[in-house]
Every structure is written in structure tokens, then in C-alpha cells.
Amino acid sequence: MYKLLTKDGMAKRGEFETVHGTIQTPVFMNVGTVGAIKGAVSTDDLRTIGTQVELSNTYHLHVRTGDKLIKEFGGLHKFMGWDKPILTDSGGFQVFSLAGLRRIKEEGVYFNSHIDGRKIFMGPEQSMQIQSNLASTIAMAFDECPSSVADRDYMENSVNRTTRWLKRCKAEMNRLNSLPDTINKHQMLFGINQGGVYEDIRVRHAQEISELDLDGYAVGGLAVGESHEEMYRILDAVVPHLPQNKPTYLMGVGTPANILEAVERGVDFFDCVYPSRNGRHGHVYTNHGKMNLFNAKYELDTRPIEEGCNCPVCRTYSRAYVRHLLKAKEMLGMRFCVLHNLYFYNKMMEEIREAIEAGRYKEYKEEKLCRMAEGE
């Protein structure tokens, strides 16, 4: 259940109660696609750096380890040693972006695995069944993820199908949560708003899915090629039509600047691979912008990645040492960068929550963006 604590303009400060603990929002979910953050980051590390929610992916866990095996283990929480909330993506985005030879039917999608080419079928019921086996805290509804350049007629048909699929997801989750062998009988369901950059289709879809009284609502199909301005325009149009007494989740977004702008528009949940992906390539986030530690100017730099940062890396190690590890292709260097980046994001969300509580979110956002744009 979502509890709105306070607002500053459209920015919301809330709490979301789940069977695995209360989530303080706005929140950034750390992405562990197959049950682990890429970059040799453990669940103990996640606890140390203040992670509230871990995100894993239904499609990847289904085609690799297998959700039935994970259910036998007692669910994803026990499997990966994590006792806080987990959100599982429905697999829809991966089916439409990774899998080959897709055939979209009313019943679902027929496709070939991107791992071994085997034929797989996934529809709303199958996605819910897999996520129930994983026993995640929050399950995402199975949706179609049309191309951002899809024409209007296709987008309207796609959105209508996504609504029908959402109703089937809700019915199947209710059925699964009533079964005696279901691990998490309190699994929550978030629906997903689609519609590309067509503002009127987005708004109509938001109004339709809001009537289904779900646990939360996501805005999907953004950050897939459109400009930042288009993304913010869609958020301005859509978020006011989603229930204000439920959390709003902007999927796959994004940069620190994206998050700061979206919070101001009323978004509560975020996820993105940027902190870990960039960290694995030696790019680290700081309050003065992004740094490339491969740059020669850091070769003898005795300072931490960011002075004043309390992450496990900055408390002990210098830029020069982390750069040395990266240049030597030591996994420790990659791990250090990922840890720092995730800590930076988690800390930024803490600052965001404090700024909303203090009624100075707009000032905080402008100061943060200005500092990050200045560079070192």
C-alpha cells in the first residue's frame, strides 16, 4: 500500500508498504537482471550502499536458470540471499527487443530464445506464472513494447491489446495468489502505460488502466530513442492521469538529470542499467558530473573518486589506484566503479526525499544540475 507523506509541487514523498519491507520513495531500483548486479556486486554490498529494491528480469531468469528451479529453492529472495523488495520486469521488453522471429497473437507472443534459438511462447498468463514462481515482491504486467517509430494505427491497436493483456494479468495473479503452493501470496501487480510519443493515446490508456485499481502504474516505452524533451512532454501529459494514491514508475530511466526532472513531474520509482554499465567501463558519477577514470590526468591523483563521498570505495581508495586496476583489467577496478555509482544514485535519491520533505525540491534540482554541468 502506498502512503503519500508530502508533496512539493508535483514531486511526491511517500512510503510503499510491501510484504518484504517498506520502500521510501522516490526510489532508484538497482538492476540485477539475472539475480545479480553486473560488476561482481553481492547482496551484502547492496545492503552496505543503501539499496532498497533490486530489479530482476522474468525473461532472462526463465530462459537461463529457469523459474521452476528457483521456485523449488523457495523463490528468488532465498535464491540470491536478499530479504528486501524485488521487482521483476514482465519480460515483455526483452521479448520484443532481444528474441528473434516474433509472432504477436492475441493469446501472446511466439518467439525464439536469444540464447539457444528454442521456441518459446509467452503471454499474460505465462508471464504471471513465471513471476509467481520467482515470488518477487512486485510483478510487472505483460505488455507489448512497440517501436518508438510505429505509426498511429499500429500504436492504437497495440495499446488496446496491452489493456486486454493487463486484465488477463490481473485475473491470473489473483488466481495464483490464492493457490496453496504459491510462495508469495501477497505479490503486487503494476500495469504499464504505452502509446509511444502520441500524447492522446498515452492519456487515454492511462485513464483506462487507472480504472483497474492496481498496486502501481508504470510509464513504459520511453528512453528508447526519443529526445529528452519528448520524454518530459509525455510525462507532463500522462502522470496527472495516473492515480496519485499509487506509485508511478518510469521504466528504464535514466541519467541523474532524467531522474531529477521526472521526480519534479511526480514519478516515484526508477531503474536503469547506466550506473553499472558505465561503471564497468570506468565511467563514474559525481556531484560535478561524470568522470572517465581511464583519462591520463588521474594517473597520479591521490583523491578519492569524489571527496566527501562515504561509499566503501571513496573511504579507502584513490582515483589513481582505481585507474590502475582498470588499466590492468583487474575485475576489482570494475567492481569499485559499479559500487561507487550505485551508492551515488542511492544517495541522490535520499537527498531528493529530504529536499521534498523540506519543501525545496526545485531549488535542490537546479543546484544539483548546475553543479553536475560545471564539471571538476
Predicted segments with their positions:
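Conserved, mostly hydrophobic/aromatic
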Residues: 21, 54, 89, 131, ...
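A non-catalytic, amphipathic alpha-helix used as a structural packing/dimerization or gating element
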Residues: 126, 130, 157, 161-168, ...
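Glycine- and acidic
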Residues: 147-151, 156, 216-222, 331-334
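Non-catalytic, usually N-terminal nucleic-acid engagement modules in DNA/RNA processing proteins
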Residues: 1-183, 296-299
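C-terminal extensions of enzymes
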Residues: 1-15, 23-32, 39-40, 143-149, ...
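Glycine-rich phosphate/ribose-binding loops and adjacent secondary-structure elements
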Residues: 163, 172, 176, 184, ...
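Surface-exposed helix-capping loop/turn segments at secondary-structure junctions
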Residues: 172-182, 246, 352-364
